[in-house]
Design a protein with these regions (language model features):
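Hydrophobic alpha-helical transmembrane segments
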Residues: 16-24, 60-64, 88-93, 119-124
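Transmembrane alpha-helical segments of multi-pass membrane transport proteins and ion-pumping complexes
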Residues: 26-38, 67-75, 100, 104, ...
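A loop-to-helix transmembrane entry motif
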Residues: 51-66
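Membrane-helix boundary connector in multi-pass membrane proteins
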Residues: 102-120
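Short, Lys/Arg-rich, polar N-terminal cytosolic tail immediately upstream
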Residues: 1-15
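Membrane-water interface at the C-terminal end of transmembrane alpha helices
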Residues: 18-27, 31, 127-145
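Hydrophobic transmembrane helix segments
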Residues: 28-55
Length: 145
């Protein structure tokens, strides 16, 4: 009789595959919500530069780029951080808060006529994208390494 031993290995969860899927969903949702906001009368035009409105696909592009940066952070934390999940969540929440600051501080300073509805909508779109991407990526990360 021969005995066999089975090695138990924990398969790493795929951060990239799920992260890219969440990125695509977040880009589509934020673009759709930006379109709805435009149709509802929210202006994405800077009164100081009315000839340069924020293009609708700009929402998709920026959501995609910055969500992919989040996917990259998750992949790095999965390999390097002692507590990947909590490190990722804390880092991304700080980055989310920092991304909202210009909507309420810098933009109105440069253009005092910038509508509050625009600032709130832009901030809301940041939160929506984060609410889609962060939980998906966090669920793919181990609690501890």
């Amino acid at each position: 009789m021969t005995s066999t031993t089975t090695e138990h290995t924990t398969a790493r969860k795929s951060v990239w595959k799920h992260g890219i899927a969440a990125t695509i969903v977040a880009a589509a949702v934020t673009t759709g919500l930006a379109y709805i906001a435009m149709r509802a009368g929210v202006s994405f035009v800077d009164p100081a530069k009315p000839e340069i409105p924020i293009p609708l696909l700009g929402f998709a592009q920026l959501t995609f780029v910055f969500s992919l940066i989040g996917v990259g952070l998750a992949a790095i934390f999965a390999r390097k951080a002692r507590r990947p999940r909590s490190t990722f969540i804390r880092t991304t929440l700080v980055l989310l808060a920092l991304s909202i600051v210009p909507d309420f501080v810098e933009i109105p300073n440069f253009s005092p006529d910038f509508a509050p509805a625009t600032a709130w909508t832009l901030a809301g779109l940041h939160v929506v994208a984060a609410a889609i991407v962060i939980p998906v990526l966090a669920s793919r990360l181990a609690e501890e390494r």
